Amino acid sequence: MVLDELISEFDRGLRSLTGISRMSRPVPAPADAPDAELTPAERTHAAGLMRVNHVGEVCAQALYQAQKLTARTASAKAMFEEAAREEEDHLAWTAHRLKELDSRPSLLNPLWYAGALAIGVAAGALGDKVSLGFMAETERQVESHLEGHMSELPATDTASRAIVDQMRIDEVKHGKAATDAGGIELPLPARMLMRAASKVMTSTAYYL
């Protein structure tokens, strides 16, 4: 681990928390009709869901930063770096959509980031196979979560739906890549604990 790498990751963390993340791909555009006018209730609900998704991407940045820094092999480091770059697109897309919905990111983002960073360090300390397994399970749970949001978002909110759908596609790819790279299946108690922690985060971030 070199100083340049630490500085680079520190910069990425600051960008994650300050809302100035760079996107390498444009914001996904709806394939069908543009947004119809959302009712105030629909707009509030969509904003809450997109705030949850934004928090998830803040956590993803912290997780993959920590896992990259603690990875043993160059191949694992490269995989975490690639996933982090695509997740940074997600971070920028969800921030963009929150602004369009006249809303804001979670007020607790520094807390979410710090917690995810600690979890990523712990996963990385257990070795690459466990760390990659943690990545695969994380992506599976995120995929399920995003599928739920697709059913909850207003049908007329085509902008949010386009973003969430592309995020889901990317998460599936990340999870498969982690499994193919040798990630092991986590034990049931670990998977259940991850779901419980995710439930606390999503329930809180919807409002705060």
UniProtKB/Swiss-Prot annotation:
Fe cation 2 binds at E87, E139, E171, H174. GO terms for biological process: ubiquinone biosynthetic process. Fe cation 1 binds at E57, E87, H90, E171. Pfam families: COQ7 (PF03232). Its cofactor is Fe cation. One of its GO terms (molecular function) is 3-demethoxyubiquinol 3-hydroxylase activity. It catalyses: a 5-methoxy-2-methyl-3-(all-trans-polyprenyl)benzene-1,4-diol + AH2 + O2 = a 3-demethylubiquinol + A + H2O. Keywords: Cell membrane, Iron, Membrane, Metal-binding, Monooxygenase, Oxidoreductase, Ubiquinone biosynthesis. Transmembrane segments: none annotated. It is found in: Cell membrane. It is a peripheral membrane protein. Pathway: Cofactor biosynthesis; ubiquinone biosynthesis. It comes from the Bacteria. Its EC number is 1.14.99.60. It is an enzyme of class 1 (oxidoreductase). Belongs to the COQ7 family. Catalyzes the hydroxylation of 2-nonaprenyl-3-methyl-6-methoxy-1,4-benzoquinol during ubiquinone biosynthesis. This is 3-demethoxyubiquinol 3-hydroxylase. It comes from Burkholderia cenocepacia (strain ATCC BAA-245 / DSM 16553 / LMG 16656 / NCTC 13227 / J2315 / CF5610) (Burkholderia cepacia (strain J2315)).
